Amino acid sequence: MNLNFKVPTWDFIMTDPSSPKLCGQKGSSKNGSPKTSSPKSGSPRACSPKLKHKNNQQLLQNDSINLSSSPSSPSSPSSPPMVGKVTVKKTHTKSSVVPSNSNGNNSPVLKVSQYQVPQNGSSPVLSPVSLIPIQDLNSPNVGYKLELEQRLHKRQLQKRLEKQIQDSEKEKQDQLLIQQQQIQQQQQQIQQQQQQIQLLLNNQNNQNQNQNQNQNQIQNNNIKNGMKLVSIPTPHPNFNNINNINNNNNNNNNNNNSYNGNIETNTPISLPPPICNKYKNNYPSCDVLFKSSLSSSSSASPFSLTPTSQSPILSSPLFHNVPSVESHFINNDSFLQLPPIRDEIF
């Protein structure tokens, strides 16, 4: 129960405003007779409520107590319950009310030495002033207070620990996210490097293939060109004259197997000119192809020319059906007889 007293050093005197009180009770005359009322009335005049606090009107403005919070017990068993305001009388005695200047006013508050624990299970609430005297330390209220303080301290510690754990978990999650991002970046860089290496390898392979194809093409072209060069025989400068001579001989001889001057072969050959003496310096092979018949047989004509067996060209099977040079030129007027071949040539 909290009682807000505005005046700290007043003794409570309960008075009944309904009971009449004589105005002359307070003092007496010299001869001991009580004062009476004025002669107008002729009877003792009761004090009216207006005159009761006439002299102390300013003092009574601050002497009221608000008893609306809880009803108080009467001062005596015979006195009626308090109604309205209660008058007080100033004395020199001290009240048990302790003044409080915590809020900046002089209103006293009652001293409370325990917790107010509600019944609904909510958190405990301290009173405005919690003063515990020395003699009350062994009371059970102090044990409740210490237990509640320990619980509050434990709750604060638990909250701090939970907050620290949450902060550490959050930091770990942030670090994991950063590490995952770094790993993803490294993987992307590795993929880019692999793509670049693959591109370089593909380009190198393409270049090598192109070079190989070009080299193969060049080799094939060279082989084809070489075969063409080898297969094409070089014509003799007097080949046309030889053809003319062969045509004349064909007209003179009615032999079907006569040589017509057309040689169908892929091997390059060189035929001697018809007149060896005239082109002896330009065609030294004439001496190799032809020599006098004296070297082969003594009965032959000294001026007859026969193909030598040592000639690799004339010994070929292609020249088996070719008539001899001796029968070709023996009856020709334009044939010049040559002297015998000297040994110095060989």
From Swiss-Prot:
Compositionally biased region (Polar residues): 56-67
Annotated region described as Disordered, given as residue ranges: 10-109
Bias-annotated ranges (Low complexity): 26-44, 94-109
Protein name from the UniProt record: Putative uncharacterized protein DDB_G0288043
